[in-house]
Amino acid sequence: MAMLVTNLSSSSFCFFSSPHLQNQKEIRSGVRVRKYVIFNRASLRTVSDCVDSITTFDRSVTDANTQLRRFCESGNLENAVKLLCVSGKWDIDPRTLCSVLQLCADSKSLKDGKEVDNFIRGNGFVIDSNLGSKLSLMYTNCGDLKEASRVFDEVKIEKALFWNILMNELAKSGDFSGSIGLFKKMMSSGVEMDSYTFSCVSKSFSSLRSVHGGEQLHGFILKSGFGERNSVGNSLVAFYLKNQRVDSARKVFDEMTERDVISWNSIINGYVSNGLAEKGLSVFVQMLVSGIEIDLATIVSVFAGCADSRLISLGRAVHSIGVKACFSREDRFCNTLLDMYSKCGDLDSAKAVFREMSDRSVVSYTSMIAGYAREGLAGEAVKLFEEMEEEGISPDVYTVTAVLNCCARYRLLDEGKRVHEWIKENDLGFDIFVSNALMDMYAKCGSMQEAELVFSEMRVKDIISWNTIIGGYSKNCYANEALSLFNLLLEEKRFSPDERTVACVLPACASLSAFDKGREIHGYIMRNGYFSDRHVANSLVDMYAKCGALLLAHMLFDDIASKDLVSWTVMIAGYGMHGFGKEAIALFNQMRQAGIEADEISFVSLLYACSHSGLVDEGWRFFNIMRHECKIEPTVEHYACIVDMLARTGDLIKAYRFIENMPIPPDATIWGALLCGCRIHHDVKLAEKVAEKVFELEPENTGYYVLMANIYAEAEKWEQVKRLRKRIGQRGLRKNPGCSWIEIKGRVNIFVAGDSSNPETENIEAFLRKVRARMIEEGYSPLTKYALIDAEEMEKEEALCGHSEKLAMALGIISSGHGKIIRVTKNLRVCGDCHEMAKFMSKLTRREIVLRDSNRFHQFKDGHCSCRGFW
């Protein structure tokens, strides 16, 4: 009391001067004192003042409530909560509690909010709709959505606003199912909904990709009479577009009685995002005609549409509109404009926009780097990346992946390594997107050791990481490593191989002729429904064709619902490899009748088929069709096919003259095709002339030296063989050893000439001796010229018995059941003696043998070969 008297005697309480002291009774009763003590803001600044005042005089409900509201109005949450906690239940009005809860919600103070909630529940307050609404709002704003939902379970909240807020916050936190569940509860509670309710819940259906749920919501909206509301219509348009239901979105848009700029922007952006840029741009034109004022979002979407459809003229017109509308200083405008020009191939305009930007961001640099990369200016892209730090702009993940993709595309290994060093220095190496891009760069540059190192150091891997490393090994001819990693992926069971994985590993099966493994993967594809992916289907057809199962390949080809050019080309190439030129031509004609235009690659496959089937006239005809009807300029590959075709059929001089008259300089591939023809037809003199041209073009290619040495050996010109082998040694070159492999019970067995490492060596040698004896009985004489050694005939015969393809075929026959097809692959051209023995083996054992060499397939059956001598 003494402290209070002291306070009252201070200058701030001058109302106690004599003019005011008229009624001592009123003063004693404390009515006026209480009134001025509670209401004077200047004096009572702390909760302790309020508590002293309230406890000193007769308390009334109005006292605490009024001061609490004062605290709430001034934002003094700390004192409001303290005062509330020392107040009794009967002092506080529920409306005051609502004010305090609102302050907690606005301040996002969960701790204070929980204290208020405890006060409410501890004092037995009835939580009605109003108080429950504020409680749920407090918990929602403070991020405790679980408690907010609990309040909704306990109390019937009647105002849609609070339902909408919680629904929206649940969706923002990623709990889309919870948001939809709250909407369903709102329906069952009979709460009157508003437009915002439907906008909130449609976003959740959209995020869950729940098309069926969204369609049901659409029906409910129409029944509820909200279908004509602009905001609801915009939400439905956005829902359908996000779920790729473009036609449904357009229908909603067309039925909207009132459209705003958001409506138009949504449908334009939706078309562009779903790969229908031209339709989006058409809507933009309608928007202009309708007199709707465009905004920055409109222009950004239109730039993206122009970029996708390469409509640079429209892009320039919109550029002018944007400048007039004063958008040219907006980052989004400049960045999308720059991207549009670079994607349309107008790099000069893109550079002009880039130079004029006053505030270049990392997005600007990334767009410019991607533009340089698209135009093949890889050096400029890398240079710009290196300049970024000089300008004080740190590249982000997107910039780094863009420049790595550029290095990968143009095989810039040294530049890629420099970027890798920068990544290490800036601790970006553990980002999964960067690591995947690094692996891809190294793999495409043929540096699989570095790619494997990046893969092994990754802390977190995803399926893209596995696909990149498996695909890298497969494309760089490390088929065994690709299959091993694929098996490891299956064993780990952390990720399931997807469409991309199987498309990456199937070429490895094809390379090894691993028919059984390929068939296992085929089963996996069918079980998981991946065959509908055209890339997978094409890879599967290619795998079976390269494993010698041409009939199965064609059956799968027929099953492809929508064949593209790759599908047809793969099958044509398959027939060509097997020597079925007429079938390849028939398929090519079928393709053209189906309205699919041939390209350079499909013509290479067709000309190859003609070459390996001896169809010279047809080969010339299609070569001319390609040039004159299809307007395709022949490349080195096309000319090489024609030279090979002429050389195989023995027209070596014509082939030589054809090369001399070519409009482009011949490379080693073309001269090499003629050199192979010289070997087939034993023309040593022309071979010497051709070989010098090949050696000049590719002096480090051992294969051509070996080919010429073999030509000399077959002609028994041993001195020339010695000189050539000495030349190889002087250059420090190494001969690529011939090897063959065969898959037995899921294991690939590899043989080199004279190999005795296989556990079945004794049985293999015994079988080959038996076959050779039977062949000699039937009048066969070993073709010892293919032994390629200067020795006695007996030694030559023994050398022939040790050829790798013979060893592989023998293992296949003695290790597999009767009737099983033998599939062997050799890295070099099969020799003539092995070819003859394979024919005899197929007849003797009544087994089909499929031998794939570096040139083509040989299918041996009943003593005959499918090549018919064209090999």
Curated annotation (Swiss-Prot):
Superkingdom per UniProt = Eukaryota
> Do you know which InterPro entries this protein is assigned to?
DYW_dom (IPR032867), E_motif (IPR046848), Pentatricopeptide_rpt (IPR002885), PPR_At4g14850-like_plant (IPR046960), TPR-like_helical_dom_sf (IPR011990)
Top-level taxonomy: Eukaryota, Viridiplantae, Streptophyta, Embryophyta, Tracheophyta
Q: Where is this region: Type E motif?
A: 670-745
User: Where would one find the signal peptide in this protein?
Assistant: none
Name listed for the protein in its UniProt record: Pentatricopeptide repeat-containing protein DOT4, chloroplastic
Its job: Plays a major role in single RNA editing events in chloroplasts. Acts as a site-recognition transacting factor involved in the edition of the unique site (corresponding to cytidine-488) of rpoC1, which is a plastid-encoded subunit of the chloroplast DNA-directed RNA polymerase. May provide the catalytic activity for editing site conversion. Involved in leaf vasculature patterning.
Give the record's keywords alphabetically.
Chloroplast, Metal-binding, mRNA processing, Plastid, Repeat, RNA-binding, Transit peptide, Zinc
Q: Where is this region: Type E(+) motif?
A: 746-776
Give the subcellular location: Plastid, Chloroplast
